[in-house]
Regions:
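Intrinsically disordered, low-complexity acidic/polar segments
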Residues: 45-46, 78-80, 95-97
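Extracellular/luminal low-complexity segments enriched in Ser/Thr/Pro
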Residues: 66-80
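Hydrophobic beta-strand residues in large extracellular and virion-surface proteins
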Residues: 1, 36-38, 46-48, 67-71, ...
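A generic beta-sheet turn/junction motif
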Residues: 52-54, 77, 92-94
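Beta-strand-rich interaction surfaces with strong enrichment in secreted/lumenal proteins
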Residues: 22-24, 57-61, 74
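Long, low-complexity ectodomains and other extracytoplasmic segments of secretory-pathway proteins
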Residues: 1-40, 92-109
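Short, solvent-exposed loop/turn segments enriched in Ser/Thr/Gly
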Residues: 28-35, 76-87
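Surface-exposed binding patches on compact interaction domains or structured appendages
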Residues: 41-66
Length: 109
């Protein structure tokens, strides 16, 4: 399984047990969105859940080997660092899989 950042067209590195997407420094009220792709074999049954309401994930099945997920951090009106998680549950080749994506960054003036 691969998770690819569509903005940079690069594979997201896995750190121990999770994938990390660093939004970096964001300006206050800036839109913080990133679309990623999960690539694998016979992907199905995707569900996603965020650890708080300030993080949103919108999955879309492209084909049996590709799922796209738009990730959004919605609290950019607050100037502070953030580190949120999105949990993905799905099956690859009929085997259950779980992937955790950390979304982090810093909102500044």
């Amino acid at each position: 399984m691969q998770i690819i950042d569509k903005q940079t067209n690069t594979e997201i590195e896995k750190s121990t047990d999770r994938y990390i997407i660093n939004f970096g420094i964001l300006k206050k009220n800036q839109i913080a969105k990133r679309t990623v792709q999960i690539k694998g074999n016979n992907l199905e049954g995707l569900t996603s859940q965020s650890d708080c309401s300030c993080t949103e994930s919108s999955p879309e099945v492209i084909d049996k080997n590709t799922i796209e997920i738009e990730l959004q951090y919605k609290n950019t009106h607050m100037t502070k660092p953030f580190d949120k998680k999105v949990y993905l549950n799905f099956h690859e080749d009929k085997q259950p899989k779980v992937a955790t994506i950390n979304i982090k960054g810093q909102v500044t003036l």
